[in-house]
């Protein structure tokens, strides 16, 4: 059975898997809702090295680069306006663990559960994984 997957750079993918954050931010919106698996990209986000909060938290986790590491439910995709950003700033940890800017989108995730890691090659956008690394681009974006 095919799984819907999104690749996220480390340490952010592991922050999700470890329950440290529940929102993923993107420059694009998705209409997809439902079960979503999180793939930790092979590359590490260089930006995180410039943020002390993120650097400190990154030391507390084992990065899982190149693996699908958790599953969740994508329940909403919210356009970031001034009001939304004002609200998110109150949750300092969540705010520091991604890029919150007017015009971006917040993907709201629930029921985040770590899984036994599955080696996989990452891709852009939401992609399908059938266990054999035969990737087909998702048309539901």
Predicted regions and their residues:
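Structured alpha/beta reader/binder surfaces that contact nucleic acids or chromatin modification marks
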Residues: 1-141
